[in-house]
Amino acid sequence: MSSSALKKWEIVIRFASSIPDLSLEISDAQTTTIHSLFKIVRNRIPECRDKQLKMVFQGRLLSPGFTVERAVRGNWQRDENDDPNIVQKAFIHCIVGPTLTEEELASQDQAQSGLNSNSESPDDLQNAQTGETLRGFDRLREAGFTETEVNNLRSQFHRLRGTNLDSLTEDAIREAEDDWIDNGGQNSSADELDMSYETLLAGVLIGFFGGAIACYFLWERTMFSLRMQLSILVGIICNFAYGLLHSYRW
């Protein structure tokens, strides 16, 4: 018997509203889909019976075609010597949307059944369900975030990371945001790494050769990112140290 079969799966559906948490024991997470969880929620919770439902795990919108195992992948890793009877638990947030008609609910079920019968991959399922694929922090709009909240989060994220938005393509920026949402920023792309080195080098050169003029950039926070400002400060310190050593030499 495989280790996957020995695991006990518990999914806790947590709602943004005052609806109590719904705990579900999943016997086969490899075949149970998010769409199946929609049906369970509608059957067990009267308030959700005719509502539009969306589920989010760690800031990532889950496609109805995803299996539970794929949706929470990485959350079940454990040592092989652990007790197989220990229940693995994950929390999935459920967003309750507007009321749907019976025709709309039936249409969703029919569309999902058709996708399952065609045996499409999870990525194809997601593309078929969402017409336009949202990337980066724009995905959070599906989770109920307003456009202002998304823009504020994006601005703060790139400011703290010192991202030079002018030197990156739109795809590279969205890729960095996707990486942070999906992996907690553990995996950085090569383009972003190269950009960070270029930013540090440019800042040090500005600080070293700019002299006192470079100090202006330390107070003008809207002109450069935090990472660039720190590298400029390093350049100024290097300039000061070089001048000090040069004066002692003479």
Swiss-Prot record:
Residue positions the entry lists as glycosylated: 187
Biased composition (Polar residues): 107-130
GO cellular component terms attached to this protein's record: Dsc E3 ubiquitin ligase complex; endoplasmic reticulum; endoplasmic reticulum membrane; Golgi membrane
Membrane topology: Multi-pass membrane protein
Transmembrane portions of the chain: 199-219, 228-248
One GO BP: protein ubiquitination
Localization, UniProt: Endoplasmic reticulum membrane; Golgi apparatus membrane
Keyword set includes Repeat: no
Keyword annotations from UniProtKB, A to Z: Endoplasmic reticulum, Glycoprotein, Golgi apparatus, Membrane, Transmembrane, Transmembrane helix, Ubl conjugation pathway
Classification via Pfam families: Dsc3_C, Dsc3_N
Coiled-coil zones: none
Residues covered by region (Disordered): 105-130
Pathway assigned in UniProt: Protein modification; protein ubiquitination
Homology family: Belongs to the dsc3 family.
PANTHER family tied to this protein: DSC E3 UBIQUITIN LIGASE COMPLEX SUBUNIT 3, TRANSMEMBRANE PROTEIN YOR223W
Subunit structure: Component of the DSC E3 ubiquitin ligase complex composed of dsc1, dsc2, dsc3 and dsc4.
Summary of the function given for this chain in its UniProt record: Component of the DSC E3 ubiquitin ligase complex which is required for the sre1 transcriptional activator proteolytic cleavage to release the soluble transcription factor from the membrane in low oxygen or sterol conditions. The complex also plays an important role in the multivesicular body (MVB) pathway and functions in a post-endoplasmic reticulum pathway for protein degradation.
Protein name as annotated: DSC E3 ubiquitin ligase complex subunit 3
Chain's gene name: dsc3
